[in-house]
Swiss-Prot record:
Pfam families: Nse4-Nse3_bdg, Nse4_C
InterPro entries on file: Nse4/EID, Nse4_C, Nse4_Nse3-bd
Transmembrane segments: none
Organism for this UniProt entry: Macaca fascicularis
Record note on quaternary structure: Component of the SMC5-SMC6 complex which consists at least of SMC5, SMC6, NSMCE2, NSMCE1, NSMCE4A or EID3 and NSMCE3. NSMCE1, NSMCE4A or EID3 and NSMCE3 probably form a subcomplex that bridges the head domains of the SMC5:SMC6 heterodimer. Homodimer, and heterodimer with EID2. Interacts with the C-terminal region of CREBBP.
Protein name: EP300-interacting inhibitor of differentiation 3
Higher taxonomy: Eukaryota, Metazoa, Chordata, Craniata, Vertebrata
């Protein structure tokens, strides 16, 4: 019976669940400063067999626990670097604000590198804390820069000028200096001029050397050459005819007369050939004179303006002159007519020669007899 009880007791002990437990006193004894060491997970292994099964590797650890351990180590390293960076900035605060180095810029670049690995709120809070510190330092540097640029002590500058010019406020009262001799003031401004000219590039003034007399403008000499030439021309009889008086009222209006003459030639052609319009270029072009051609164009423009004829383009897109009946003439004289158009004709000497050759114009339609 004793043997059976012992065997049952052994079996009961094997069937019980055994736990590997770490006492709380031993856990509390771990140093809190060892923050840089990787976090260790205390796992309670539930064993149903003997203790030899633990060493055989049958109890596997979850890979997620290993990943969490690695992430915790990375985050702890980032926090440590952030704290170290803020500590260095606090220690060098005076040098960063008062000097012109790039310490603040380098610290911001280092913080940007650390921020690339931030994935949790705790590290992001440290980054925000560092940014607040950096912004305060930047504000202090900006205030110091503005104060240095805008600072100008007017009184100190005036004292420096007086000392440089040989005057000193400490030698007497300001009222005494206001009544100083003109020679002292002149010497002061001469000293200022001498110093200022050394900083300015300026050419020396040019002075003429005329001797001891005072320069006076010379009297203008009368021009006798022109009078001599006029006398010679009068003696030789080469003087042009002088125009005593121009009386325009004694001459008839040449433009109106020429327009009426050309209108008569045009109406004669229309009566002879009522159904055949005349070519504009053949009518106005004078193959022997470019100036006469320009005058003919000028006179024909009055005929078209008054509505005695009109200009249009034929099938070849060339200008032609054709007569107008009584109704069309009334419409042409009406200033409110919407069909009236104005144009500008330009004609060069080369274009005149080309037109004469192209149209084979050998004789002018507008004769010269009445000129």
């Amino acid at each position: 019976m004793s043997v059976e009880k012992a065997s049952r007791k052994g079996d009961d002990e094997k069937g019980e669940e055994q736990l590997v437990v770490i006492p709380s006193s031993e856990y509390a004894a771990k140093p809190a400063a060892a923050e840089g060491a990787p976090m260790k997970m205390d796992v309670a292994v539930r064993v149903t067999g003997c203790s030899d099964d633990l060493s055989s590797g049958d109890a596997d650890i979850d890979p997620k626990l290993l990943e969490l351990t690695a992430d915790e180590e990375k985050c702890r390293s980032i926090r440590r670097q952030y704290r170290q960076l803020m500590y260095c900035v606090r220690q060098n605060r005076g040098d960063i604000v008062n000097s012109a180095n790039n310490s603040l810029t380098e610290a911001l670049e280092e913080a940007n590198v650390l921020f690339d690995g931030v994935s949790r709120t705790r590290e992001a809070a440290l980054d925000a804390q560092f940014l607040v510190m950096a912004s305060d330092l930047g504000k202090e540097k900006a205030k110091q820069l503005n104060s240095d640029l805008n600072f100008f002590n007017q009184l100190a500058f005036c004292d420096f000028l007086f000392l440089f010019g040989g005057l000193n406020w400490m030698e007497g009262e300001p009222d005494d200096l206001s009544d100083c001799d003109d020679n002292i003031a002149l010497s002061f401004w001469k000293a200022m001029e001498k110093e200022a000219t050394s900083w300015m590039v300026k050419a020396e003034t040019f002075h003429f050397v005329f001797g001891s007399f005072k320069l006076e403008p010379s009297a203008p000499k009368p021009r006798l050459e022109h009078q001599k030439k006029v006398r010679k021309m009068e003696e030789n009889g080469n003087m042009p005819t002088k125009l005593r008086k121009l009386d325009l009222s004694s001459y008839p209006e040449a433009t109106e007369k020429n327009v009426e003459r050309i209108l008569g030639l045009l109406q004669t052609y229309f009566r002879k050939y009522p159904d055949t319009p005349v070519s504009y270029f053949e009518f106005v072009i004078d193959p022997n004179s470019f100036s006469r051609t320009v005058e003919n164009i000028f006179y024909v423009s009055f005929i078209v303006r008054d509505g005695f004829a009109r200009i249009r383009l034929d099938e070849d897109r060339l200008p032609i002159l054709e007569p107008m009946n009584v109704n069309q003439m009334g419409e042409g004289n009406d200033s409110s007519c919407h069909g009236r158009k104005q144009g500008v004709i330009s004609l060069t000497l080369q274009e005149w020669k080309n037109i004469v050759a192209a149209f084979e114009i050998s004789e002018a339609m507008i004769t010269y007899s009445s000129y």
